[in-house]
Amino acid sequence: MDNNGIVVRKFSFKKEFTRFFLVIALFVFVIFFYCFNPRFLTYMNIMNILREMSVMATLSMSAMFVLMVGELNFGIGAEATMAASLLGTLLASQILPGYTLCFVAVLVLMMAVAWLNSRLTCYLRIPAFIATLAASKLWDSAIYKMTGGKTFFSTKWGDVFTTIGQGYTGPIPNLVIGLVIMTAIAWILLEKTRLGRHIQAAGGNAVSATQVGIPVRRVKCVAFFLATLYASVAGIFLSSKTGNITPLMGSNMMMDAICSAMLGATFWRIGRYNIPGTLVAACMMAVISNGLTTMGAADWVQFVLQGIMLTIAVAYIAITREEGLPGVKLA
């Protein structure tokens, strides 16, 4: 405080560097990959990165909703694949007329998955990471039944199946437009509604939230429903992008999505899971994946390098921040 009674905040390089670590890391990765391959920043490759980011960010927001209420959902990968498999099955069987009706039907059916997750966790009080992991095995069995345990594709899907994932509206990929819509919905819900404030309060201190009248159990249930909704959309985005469905396509992205959501808590609102941080982290993950691919790195090298980079990033933030990384309840 100065002589005039005005509070003066001291600049802390360590604090500010930690706060913007994700953005700095993103630029470092971009420069690194560009130096190895100047084609990394061509228009087409940037569009590929944005398309990959759109899927990752949508799935990361799915993880973020549950992390916000202090829980951990290990079922979002299976839920993503489940939604894509249901959509592919409905379109191939032609039980329902039109893509839109099938899309809506899938989202409605996936709410049954969310209902089971919320009941197991919020009412039977089974730790969320155990309940969702166990439930994901049920979804895996259904996925293998629908796909036959192999790549699933049908000529009956038509071009509409890949319109979202491979099409463009002008110069902008449809996937990016889809991400903007999903982000806007999440932002309005979390930042402009009472439910959003309750979700953030429930994760901060459930006991205090209950004492001030917030229905924590109900709020957590809503978080699981939102997580399943976003995981379902992410799965549909991914299958539309690739043009087919594989049994493990969602599960292969799950840990990256959870890491993105957790790393997002180190940007913008430090110590709190938030949308801007999640988007930046998802973009960084997409840049890493695309950059290693353009360098011609083998798959196992990509996994090793991604693991090392994520470990270094998380360890650095955990060490430099006094509070460490935001936590979740595992019991």
Give, region by region, the residue ranges found by the protein language model.
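Inter-helical junctions in multi-pass inner-membrane proteins, predominant
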Residues: 38-48, 143-144, 190, 196, ...
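Hydrophobic core segments of alpha-helical transmembrane domains in multi-pass membrane transport
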Residues: 22-34, 63, 107-110, 136-140, ...
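Cytosolic-side transmembrane-helix boundaries in multi-pass membrane proteins
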Residues: 1-31, 204, 210-218, 290-331
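Helix-loop-helix "hairpin" substructures at the membrane interface of multi-pass membrane proteins
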Residues: 98-106, 112-117, 168-245
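Alpha-helical transmembrane segments within multi-pass membrane transporters and channels
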Residues: 95-136, 184, 280-281
